[in-house]
């Protein structure tokens, strides 16, 4: 009996070591690009271009960060990205939440067809909309107008918002709505006063995913926004140039990458528990 227990314990230890090693490897692979960019952003130009590579420099510098804010209106780019991403996220939640609730709880006619259509739409990349949107923007004279990117961002995020929130709404107990109806609540009052307060994890999850997409989107912003003071961070980072046309400014690009990534990292870290709840809740039922 003791031998069997020893073998079982050794087996558990081996399994634990394997799982820990695998997780450590995955974490390392995931963090390696970020760590490399972070180190590069603090390197001197000589260390960045030195061969063999200097992995950990003896001297660090903040010149690349100060250069961003002295030679470029980088704070303006951050504010632009925050405004566009926040507005498009709010719009996608405003329109997506009632649609998801209707599909999950009210069972309208043709709901299965609607859901299937939403799933099919998610299979197509947003870039396919570019030529059509370009004609619409020209016709409505929306060039260099934030509406030309806010509306497409909201529309592209709508399917994700509807699908995630629908799965969350479907697992809510029907007794909540029955009790609300007895108290005299109509559908809109039920949604605003009862359903939404208990669906915070799902709302935060879909909101953050929508925000990240809008923050990082490049093609639409590059096409529809050309005025310097209206550009978003991805465009600003892509257009960082060196002192000559042959120079690649690795340091400033790395610094800009870290600055543009930091807000997203902080948001995800702050709301990580809500994100996990929101993503797993729809997988339990529905």
Question: Where are the predicted features?
Answer:
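Short, Lys/Arg-rich, polar N-terminal cytosolic tail immediately upstream
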Residues: 1-12
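A structural signal for multi-pass alpha-helical bundles of membrane permease subunits
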Residues: 9, 15-286
């Amino acid at each position: 009996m003791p031998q069997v227990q020893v073998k079982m314990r050794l087996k558990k230890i081996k399994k634990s070591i394997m799982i820990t090693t695998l997780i450590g490897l995955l974490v390392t692979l995931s963090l390696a690009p970020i760590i490399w960019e972070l180190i590069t952003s603090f390197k001197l130009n000589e260390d960045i271009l030195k061969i063999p590579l200097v992995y950990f420099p003896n001297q660090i510098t903040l010149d690349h960060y100060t250069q961003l804010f002295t030679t470029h209106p980088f704070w303006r780019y951050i504010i632009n990205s925050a405004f566009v991403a926040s507005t498009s996220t709010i719009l996608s939640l405003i329109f997506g939440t009632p649609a998801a609730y209707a599909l999950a709880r009210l069972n309208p006619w043709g709901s299965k067809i609607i859901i299937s259509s939403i799933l099919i739409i998610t299979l197509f990349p947003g870039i396919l909309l570019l030529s059509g949107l370009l004609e619409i923007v020209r016709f409505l004279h929306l060039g260099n107008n934030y509406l030309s990117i806010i509306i497409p961002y909201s529309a592209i995020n709508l399917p994700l918002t509807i699908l995630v929130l629908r799965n969350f709404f479907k697992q809510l107990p029907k007794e909540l709505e029955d009790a609300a109806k007895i108290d005299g609540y109509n559908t809109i009052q039920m949604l605003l006063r009862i359903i939404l307060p208990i669906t915070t994890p799902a709302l935060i999850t879909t909101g953050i995913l929508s925000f990240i997409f809008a923050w990082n989107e490049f093609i639409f912003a590059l096409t529809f926004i050309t005025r310097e003071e209206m550009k978003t961070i991805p465009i600003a980072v892509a257009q960082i140039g060196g002192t000559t046309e042959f120079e690649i400014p690795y340091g400033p690009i790395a610094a800009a990458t870290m600055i543009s990534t930091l807000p997203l990292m902080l948001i995800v870290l702050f709301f990580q528990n809500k994100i996990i709840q929101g993503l797993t809740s729809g997988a339990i039922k529905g």
